[in-house]
UniProtKB/Swiss-Prot annotation:
Species, as recorded: Clostridium botulinum (strain Loch Maree / Type A3)
Cofactor detail note: Binds 2 divalent ions per subunit.
Compartment list: Cytoplasm
Binding-site residues, L-methionine: 55, 98, 247, 278
Binding annotation for ATP: 14, 172-174, 238-239, 247, 253-254, 270, 274
Positions of the UniProt region annotated as Flexible loop: 98-108
Designated name of the protein: S-adenosylmethionine synthase
């Protein structure tokens, strides 16, 4: 049976991604000085303006306007002709402390209040909700091919802009890849869509030629392309006005880009700007860690795990697994292995993945999962042998 599946990615200069990177830059700056700081930082951008808001409880001081300007400069919006300038944009901040009602549940979990002695029970989940982790062996990154290929194309767009290969490119851009599957395995790429902001001096014909030569051919293996592969490069014909001048942006608006490109389910919670006591982030990272190690251990070809939490309670209220018919053992047996090998209380996740560190801005663009260009703890295959002992 053949079917098509499509996923998209965006570059670091996309308005929503600017916001994610600013929020995580603030988080990293606080965790660097105060590892126990509580951060829920949201950012909005529009023409000539950035607003940073949220709830932050910390013992340290960070210069938020300076962080904002440094982040925007690093992305590439450093002159007015790009429609957004790190030096001249206004920066507005509105920061409150974390709610005492939330803090009391995180500081002392329900289990601790009942007298349970394990110190990891003292850290309650920062919110209720469900988080999903996913892995598949269809790529070496254990990610679905559509999102993995879309991310690589987006990163390449930024690379050829910054290294001067295509100096007329601007920071904003999007990619989209449609993969054809046969009996559950990727066999070819059916369509590639790339929209990239550019200077007014260049024409579409040149952009199409350069993107095919310096982006697509460099990234996409030739065996996945054929005479029927369709290419859509700047299909509107012109993309000069972009970034916050073209669209306003908000933190947390690219949650499917951040995860599995729609191939796996999503619990709805965004990542950026949240410290690791927020299970929206830490438990989603843990779920990816669990799923990737299970697939790498040969438990299944494809696996999705759901974790669910109650605010102020340490232990997950439920753990569910789906192997989509690819499991070598039953889903119930896999859940049993998960409970034996992994401790999924928030305090244990923070400890085992060492999450109270400034490691978040680096994943705020080009995906939080499947990253081989950086070392992030939830991508490590450090539980494979232990899992195999229980199969």
């Amino acid at each position: 049976m053949r079917k098509l599946f499509t996923s998209e990615s965006v570059t670091e200069g996309h308005p929503d991604k600017i916001c994610d990177q600013i929020s995580d830059a603030v988080l990293d700056a606080i965790l660097d000085k105060d590892p126990n700081g509580r951060v829920a930082c949201e950012t909005a951008v529009t023409t000539g303006m950035v607003m940073v808001m949220g709830e932050i409880s910390t013992k340290c001081y960070v210069d938020i306007p300076k962080l904002v300007r440094e982040t925007i400069r690093g992305i590439g919006y450093d002159r007015a002709k790009y429609g957004f300038d790190c030096e001249t944009c206004s920066v507005i901040t509105s920061i409150d402390e974390q709610s005492v009602d939330i803090a009391m549940g995180v500081d002392e979990a329900l289990e601790s209040k009942k007298g349970e002695m394990d110190k990891l029970d003292a850290v309650g989940a920062g919110d209720q909700g469900m988080m999903f982790g996913f892995a598949t062996n269809e790529t070496k990154e254990y990610m679905p091919m559509p999102i993995e290929m879309a991310h690589k194309l987006s990163r390449r767009l930024s690379e050829v802009r910054k290294n001067g290969t295509l100096p007329y490119l601007r920071p904003d851009g999007k990619t989209q890849v449609t993969v054809e599957y046969e009996n559950g395995k990727p066999v070819r790429i059916d369509a590639i869509v790339i929209s990239t902001q550019h200077g007014p001096e260049v024409y579409l014909e040149q952009i199409e030629k350069d993107i095919k030569e310096h982006v697509i051919k460099v990234i996409v293996p030739s065996e996945l392309l054929d005479e029927n592969t369709k290419y859509f490069i700047n299909p509107t014909g012109r993309f000069v006005v972009g970034g916050p001048q073209g669209d306003s942006g908000l933190t947390g608006r690219k949650i499917i880009v951040d995860t599995y490109g729609g191939y796996g389910r999503h619990g709805g919670g965004a990542f950026s700007g949240k410290d690791p006591t927020k299970v929206d982030r830490s438990a989603a990272y843990a779920a990816r860690w669990v799923a990737k190690n299970l697939v790498a251990a040969g438990v299944a070809d494809k696996l999705e795990i759901q974790l669910a939490y109650a605010i102020g309670v340490a232990k997950p209220v439920s753990i569910s697994v789906d192997t989509f018919g690819t499991g070598k053992i039953t889903d119930e047996e896999i859940v049993s292995i998960v409970n034996k090998v992994f401790d999924l209380r928030p305090g244990a996740i923070i400890r085992d993945l060492d999450l109270r560190r400034p490691i978040y801005k680096q994943v705020a663009a080009y995906g939080h999962f499947g990253r081989t260009d950086i070392d992030v703890p939830w991508e490590r295959l450090d539980k494979v042998e232990e899992i195999k002992k229980h199969i």
